[in-house]
Amino acid sequence: MRYVAHGAADEFLYAVMIRACAESGEPEPERALDLFTEMTIDKQISPTTYTYNAVILTCARSKKFALEAFRLAREMLNSHRDAYGKTPSRLRPDNATYRALLEAAKRIGDLPRARWILAQMTSDAQTFQEGERPVYIDERVMTHFFHTYASYRPPFRRDAVSYVQKDEAEDQNFGPLDNASENRVEATDISYRPSVPQSRQEIIKEVTALWGRILEDRRDVMTDNQNHSSPYHLVFGHVSLTSTLLNAYMAVHYIHSPPSVAYKVYANLFEPLRLRRDAFTYVLALEAYAKGRRTSKEELRYALSVARNIWKDWRQLEDVGVSQMSTHPNSEGVDARVVERAWSAMMRLLTM
């Protein structure tokens, strides 16, 4: 009866319904996949990039279905190629596609896939042709990328390495492996280096270099400096410096840097760029020092002293935000949930 009273749903309507599954408070990937199957299989409606973006985003926002997002992306690229191996223009990935895939990568801490996506976006930006939707790296892309670094867990932990005493090693008989040292490949050989960071130090080194490149490209854009021989010059020229982007960069330091280094970055990051710290800046910092692992009383005292400094600035912002909440909702990013998180983090620190 419903289908008699109303016209048949078209591709755009299905895309809107699927996108709604991602925008709800709790993503509904199962319902989105059911709608996508109904559209493509039952109704024989050909999907477009917009439809794929909707279903990929819905799956990406659920950790359980994050890998399904990558499967759908492969289907989008491979199952509709023509005889020459080219994907039709209506199914070529755009910025929304890559952002959705990065959201899936950060959900599961999949840094190799995130790095591949960024490299692919860089390549697509260089090979952009007239009539195609442009692909470029902006601040939303880099926010997801930094969050992926924050959620990535390196395989190597120095404190987990077990050492063998020299005398014990000499007593052991390793048989055919005794001569292995003669054919050992030096660790400095670049061909044997891992493709992703293997320790927290390598993560911070890589992220710091990436952040420096963003600032360099932004500076060249502002000064209109085009004198550069690299084809990848200004690849980060579309990245706007926002508090959200800086918060994502700080999240990497909170997870992988020592507390003292993270606070030094926090204290010196915003003012030189003439950006204000928003509510999430303070909440993320307080939660980082409340949840961080501390192995000594000195580290606990340091975390508490840093948190007190952050708390003073937060209270000033909170007072302004709460006073304006009735007339300007979400003023300065302050809402009831953010206030709750800030107070919970500080109380947790004080009770340690």
Q: Which role fits each region the language model picked out?
A:
Residues 1-352:
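A basic, Ser/Thr-enriched alpha-helical scaffold prevalent
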